[in-house]
Amino acid sequence: MFGLIKSATRKTAIKTLTSATEDALESLFSNMEGTDALLSRLGVDRQQALDAVVSDDEVAACLEDLHAAMLNKPWRIYGEDLGDEDKDRLWKTLKRHLPALAEIVLTARLGGYGVGRYVYQPEPDGFLTIKHISNKSGELAKYIPYRDGSLVYRGTGGEEACNTDVLYLFIAHRATSTNPAGEMAAARLYAPVALRKKGFIYAAQFITRYAQPYLIAKIQANSNDDHDSFMSRFYRFVSGGALSIEREDDVMMLQNSADGQAFRRLENLANARIQKTLLGKVKTSDLETASRASQETEENNRDERIGAYLALLSRAAQHFIDALVMVNNAYGKPI
């Protein structure tokens, strides 16, 4: 009976200790303020938020799932009066660069917009193919989108307009006239990522202090000399070795029985927010209980969530094909 009362009290205490953090995360995600206002309240800019979020391992795991799911979908190229040879060449070129396009799409989802630069190379028959796509996620802050849909590179030499027809790929996520840079998921993910990275630095001092066991010795000491002599042998025993004691003496170990439930609950709160934002649902492997039915539901919701990313990827793929056709019709082998 005492065990049941103790267990219930402990569970309530853990929930109480983490309720303030849970409420703060809930308030952050339910707030309808825009990206710029939220970043201002957090005290970081777009690039800082994006870099912090992308470097998190839980975010990286979710992005890997999304990246694999996007590449797993079938694709087909169609065009009126398009010959089989040109269609095969366009498809092989697109297929080779689909992973890079998917990376830029994920950057657009996290950072509000994604930018990639096409690097062209001529082939022996005169066809201008795209050799490489340079993802500009590491310097996204230097590329400024404007309300008219144009993109400007702001470097040390001033501003320079970017050719978004054939040279640059520019994909924005939910861009509006008042927010041409798009809605970035990294702004809302910054708080749970910071909790995962920095919150447990604070908790580590308690782990260091209370996770180690304590040895307690009870002896029959007739004088301080007897006590000091035993303590000297006891310290040597702790460092390694053996210890002999009298029949009336006793040595026991006290160890903290806490299993880290409070810390695990905080981590689960952060992971759930990250997964729900990116995947649309918390993974069943991170839930306390999971069933076959819930796993099937998770797969269905995951497929629906992938549709939003595929819409961005289809825009990127269409831009890729259009750029190839325009460049070759103007300077290379006409298609």
Where are these predicted regions, by residue range?
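A eukaryotic "domain-start" boundary segment
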Residues: L39-I77, G83
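Intrinsic-disorder/low-complexity, polar/charged segments
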Residues: D51-V59, M184, N222-S223, I306
